[in-house]
Amino acid sequence: MAKKLIPTYESVADELTATAEAVRSQMFGMPCLKRGSKAFAGDYHGAMVFKLRGEAHAQALALRGAHLFDPSGRDRPMKEWVVIPAEHAAHWPEFARLALETVVEAR
């Protein structure tokens, strides 16, 4: 029986930079993915962060351990950004595509 591979930030980034107009960049000192000048996903201490809205935002926050992204650590979270821990890595590719749509729609 073949072992199912768990997505990593690198595998998600590889897929989106190969198939979408996404590029690797940096945001707050962390590796991130951007479309144009807009960041939509990033690698944060072994978790991934995603810029999400609406139902996708609610679904992400419903995952155990997920929370709003607070890069300053001063209780000032970025309201559209959700940290999804590695235990939910199987969902990362889906949330990355939804986050990409968020910045595409904003154009």
Describe the predicted segments one by one.
Residues 1-107:
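Charge-dense, helix-prone N-terminal extensions
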